[in-house]
Amino acid sequence: EDNRSVADFLLKSCKDYNEGAYYYDLDFAISDAYLELASKGALYAPHEHSNCIYSATLLINYQEGHSPLKFRRNVAGSYYPVMQFPNKDYTAFNMTEATVPMKEGDLIIYPSSMTHGYEGNPYDDRVSMTVNFIPDK
């Protein structure tokens, strides 16, 4: 029962995110989920998730000072703009790297193809769950 309610929460959250982002004409399923326990000094090298549309990280035990997720725009790809000009200010559309403010209990959903990770964790017991979403049959 508890597992079903967690899955329902995650699927509804993914649906809501999709409607505010790419708005794909899809229903979603969870392909996999895993827990991560990070001790002091742990890091998660920048990476992407393949064969899924969206990924999410649920912060289960996240104290102030634990390492936040950092997202990076892939600037080595052929689709990165050829022409660039100085920016007046940074926005979500022109930054090459961003750290999202987060707190315990937050669910952060992002495109699976977006590079993400975190740098050296300064404290023990950073617990998170990562979930990957795929199209439902």
Predicted region positions:
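A generic structural micro-feature
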Residues: 27, 48-52, 123-125
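Non-heme Fe(II)/2-oxoglutarate
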Residues: 1-26, 43, 68
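Catalytic core of non-heme Fe(II) oxygenases with the double-stranded beta-helix
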Residues: 38-109
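Short loop/turn segments at connectors of secondary-structure elements within structured domains
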Residues: 29, 63-65, 125
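Catalytic core of Fe(II)/2-oxoglutarate
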Residues: 90-137
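Hydrophobic residues positioned within well-ordered beta-strands of beta-sheet architectures
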Residues: 33, 54-56, 127-131
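Short helix-to-loop capping/linker segments positioned immediately adjacent to catalytic or ligand/cofactor-binding
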Residues: 20-24, 42-46, 57-58, 116-119
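A short glycine-rich, His/Asp/Glu-containing loop-to-beta-strand
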Residues: 28-36
